[in-house]
Amino acid sequence: MRLSSAGFNPQPHEVTGEKRVLNSELWHACAGPLVSLPPVGSRVVYFPQGHSEQVAASTNKEVDAHIPNYPSLHPQLICQLHNVTMHADVETDEVYAQMTLQPLNAQEQKDPYLPAELGVPSRQPTNYFCKTLTASDTSTHGGFSVPRRAAEKVFPPLDYSQQPPAQELMARDLHDNEWKFRHIFRGQPKRHLLTTGWSVFVSAKRLVAGDSVLFIWNDKNQLLLGIRRANRPQTVMPSSVLSSDSMHLGLLAAAAHAAATNSRFTIFYNPRASPSEFVIPLAKYVKAVYHTRVSVGMRFRMLFETEESSVRRYMGTITGICDLDPTRWANSHWRSVKVGWDESTAGERQPRVSLWEIEPLTTFPMYPSPFPLRLKRPWPPGLPSFHGLKEDDMGMSMSSPLMWDRGLQSLNFQGMGVNPWMQPRLDTSGLLGMQNDVYQAMAAAALQDMRGIDPAKAAASLLQFQNSPGFSMQSPSLVQPQMLQQQLSQQQQQLSQQQQQQQQLSQQQQQQLSQQQQQQLSQQQQQQLSQQQQQQAYLGVPETHQPQSQAQSQSNNHLSQQQQQVVDNHNPSASSAAVVSAMSQFGSASQPNTSPLQSMTSLCHQQSFSDTNGGNNPISPLHTLLSNFSQDESSQLLHLTRTNSAMTSSGWPSKRPAVDSSFQHSGAGNNNTQSVLEQLGQSHTSNVPPNAVSLPPFPGGRECSIEQEGSASDPHSHLLFGVNIDSSSLLMPNGMSNLRSIGIEGGDSTTLPFTSSNFNNDFSGNLAMTTPSSCIDESGFLQSSENLGSENPQSNTFVKVYKSGSFGRSLDISKFSSYHELRSELARMFGLEGQLEDPVRSGWQLVFVDRENDVLLLGDDPWPEFVSSVWCIKILSPQEVQQMGKRGLELLNSAPSSNNVDKLPSNGNCDDFGNRSDPRNLGNGIASVGGSFNY
C-alpha cells in the first residue's frame, strides 16, 4: 500500500512544508470534527484494549479467546508521545495517524510536569460544506448537485450576468492532486451543479452512494477537496494484509515489550474505523477519572458526529459501572460505563462508553463540601473508623485525588494545578454564630483560669479562638500580651463612647417600664425568697446568718437587677463590653494575684447577651468547655438549685447561683470572694455560700426555664438551662456526660463539623457520648429512657428503607452483624451492587434517622448502638447529596424565624421525615418517597 505523508516535523523543502499545512487542515476535516491528536512531546495514555477494538472493527472479526494474554501488560500505559505523522491512503484517501510512544517508568511518572493542552484542537475549517452522495451524484452521466447556500458560501461567486452563469473550479485533494470542475447554475428549478470533471473524480476515487465529499475554502483562497468513506465491512481481505489474530498478537506483544524495556513502539490510529480514541492526553484522562464522580442513575450527554460533518449531543443515563472484560483487562477504565440512550434511533450507539467521552450533567468537586456529613459523636478509640479508614488518615484520604485509583498508584499530579482543591478545609459554617458568643468567652475564660492556666496564655488562646476567621490548623500563633493590651485599650475607647449613648437610651427605656411589670417582678421576687430559703436549707447554711433586713435588701436588689436586665437586653454593646472586660484581666501580666473568680464575676455582671443585630447567636455546647473536668468537679460545678423564677419581658430568667466547692485555690479564699461580691454591689453576701458564682442565663432562641409545680425534693427540679444536672439522678451517671447542647431557634443544635481529625480531637475528642435512649423534647428537657417508652415504642427490629424513585422496603436489621452485611443487602435490594460499598467513587450515600431525630451517616455509631437507635434508613443519590449541601448553606445564611421544633410523630412513623422543616433535617433535599427521578 503506497502512502503519502505529511507530519509535524519540518521538511527539507519549502514546497513540502506548504503541502504539510494544506494536508494537515484537510486531514483533520476528513478525520471528523471529534478527532483530536495529542501534541508531540506530551504525555498520553495508551489503551491496548482500545487498539484491539480498532483491529476488530477494521477486520470485522472479534478477538479469539485462544490469543494468549500478557499479565504484565497494564490496561493503560502512560507514555511519552515522541512523534505524530498524518497519513492518507493513495487509493482510498483513508486518513490515519502514525504515533511513536515510549512508556514511562515509575520514577518518570512521579516527576511533576506542566500539562499540555487536552489535545490539538481539531482543525475544522469554518468555511466548508459536507454532503453525503446520492445515487444520482455518483452516476456517470449526471453531475453533482450542490446546495444553494453551500455553493454561495464556499465557491467563488458566479457572474449571474452570463447566461447561464458558470465558472471553472480547481480543488486540491490530500495528496496535493488538482481536480477541475465546471460549476454551473441551471435547471428547473435552477440549482448549482458540478458537471465537467465530476465523473472523472468519482471514477478515480471509486465513490459510491453513502460516501461523503467535503469542499473547503481556506484562508489562502484555495479550494480543498476531501473524502469520507462510508463504514462498510470488508468481506475479502487482501492477501498482503495480516490476519486479524496476527494483528492482535502483534500489538499486544509490542506494547508488552515496550512496557517492560521502556523502549519506543509505533501504533497506527484510524479515526474513521476506530470506535473510540485509544490514545488520549494524560490531562484529559486524569480529569475524567480522578476529578469527576459518576454513579448509576446519573444523567449525561455525549457528542456524536452527524452526516453533515457537524456534532450533536445525545442524552443518556448511566446504568452501570464495571469492567468491560474483567478476565483479560481487569481494573481498566476503557468503556467502564454502561449507558442507556434516550432516543430510540440511537440503536447503533455504543452500549458502553469511557469516562472521558461523556459529560455528566451533575459534577462533584473533589474538595470537601461546605456542609459535610458530620460525625454525631467522637469515634471511640480502638474501633474501626469510617469505611475502614483510620481516623487520623480519614481527612487526607477523603481528599486524595488518587483515593480510588485502581491501577496507577504511582501517579503524581501536583503539577496540574488541582492540588489546592484537594486540601482538607475546616468547615466554618458551624462557626458563624460563635464570633460574638459571650457565654462561650465567659465560660472558657473563667473555667480555664480556675484550672490554674497562665492568664496571659489563656487570654491569647481565647482571643485567637474567638476572632480567628479560619481557625488555622497548621501554625496557631500565640498573641503577645503587649499587642493584646493595645488592642483591648482601643476597643475599650470605642466601647466607652457606645456605652455613653446606650446609657441615655437605657434611662429612657427604664422610665417607660409599666407599673404592671414592676408589680409582677415584685411577686416573682417574693416567690424567689421562699425558694432561696429552701436553697439554704439544702446547702446546709444556717438561717441564723440571714437577718430579715438583709433578705429584704436582697429582695430590693434583685428587683432592681431584673428591671435593669429588661433595659440591658436592648444594649447591643453589653456583650462586647463583657468580652473586653474579661480580656483586660487575663491579658495583664502584672496582676498575678487576681482572684480566680474576678474574671468570671466581671462577666457575670453583664446581664444581657444579645448581639449587635438584635438576635440571639448560636452557641456551642457547654460540655465542650467542661469536658476536661473530673466527675466530682463537673457535678459540683453544675449542682444548681431550682430557682423557678418567671420569665422577664425579654424572655430570660434572673441569674441563678452555681456552687462549686472544689474551686479552692491558695490565696483565693473567702475574703477575695467577698471583695468580688462587694464590687458587684451585692448586699446579700451572707445569703450565698462563699464559693458561689453567678452564671448568666444561657443565650439561645429557646426559653431556658419552665414553670414547674413539683416540690423541692423532685429529682427533676435541679435544672441547668432546662437540663437535669442532679448527679444522683439516673440521667447523670457520670457528671457532665449527658449534658447536651440545647437547640437554638428552629431547634438546631449547634456543633462544630471539622474535616480535620486532628482539629476535631483538640476540641471534641474527649467528649463523652450520650446514651441513645435519651432525647430532648420540645421544651428542651432531657428525658430518661423510661419516659420515652410511650412516645417512641420499639416493638420490633424491622426498619424502613427508602430510596428516591423506588418503593420503600422493610428490613430486619437484627439478622446482620456488621455494616458490611447491611450495605450488601441494601445494594442487592435496590440494584446498587458495588455502589454502596464505595460511596466516594459512586457518590451514593447511606444515612439513617435515629430515635433522637438526627440524620447521621451510616457507620457513625458502633454496630450495637446503631441497631438500638436506628429509626429508618435512606439511600441518597449523588444529586440528593448535593442538594443537602445546598440546603445546609441556605439554612446557615438565613435567620430562623420561629422556635418551632419539628419532631418525629408520636406514633413513631418516619414516612414524612423528608417534608419537615427542622434545620437538622438534612433530608430536605431528599426527594419524596415513591417519587420519580427529575432530571
Curated annotation (Swiss-Prot):
- Read off the SUPFAM superfamilies from this record: CAD & PB1 domains (SSF54277), DNA-binding pseudobarrel domain (SSF101936)
A GO term for molecular function: DNA binding
Per UniProt, subcellular location reads as: Nucleus
Annotated S-S bridges: none
Tissue-level expression: Expressed in the whole plant.
Q: Where is this region: Disordered?
A: 536-624, 645-714, 896-917
Under what name is this protein listed?
Auxin response factor 6
Q: Which gene encodes it?
A: ARF6
